[in-house]
Amino acid sequence: MGIDEAITDLTARISTASLEAVIRVKRRSDEEASIRVYAPVEHEEAIKAATQEQTLRLLTEEGLDVQVLVYDIATSLPPEQ
C-alpha cells in the first residue's frame, strides 16, 4: 500500500466515524503524512477507534507514518487548506 491509498483508507474510516468531520491532509513525503480531523468532541473516541489500529499497522507493516490528529471543532477552527 502506498501513502495515497493509506490516506484514502483513513479518511474513509474517519468519515464513517463522524459525518461532521472536517479533514485536512498534509503529505510530507512518499512515506509520511498527517491527517488533521476537526470534529465534535463527542466523536473523538469513535475516530480514534476507527483509525488507531490501522495507523499502527501501516507503520509496522508498510513503513508508512500517517498521523491522525483530532481537534475539537468547537475550539479549533480548521484551516482553509
What spans do the regions from the language model cover?
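Short amphipathic alpha-helix segments
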Residues: G2-A17
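Alpha-helix boundary/N-cap detector
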Residues: G2-E5, E42, A46, A50
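Short edge beta-strands and adjacent turn/loop segments
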Residues: S15-S34
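Short beta-strand-to-loop capping motifs
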Residues: V37-V41
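C-terminal low-complexity, charged extensions that often adopt amphipathic alpha-helices
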Residues: V68-V70
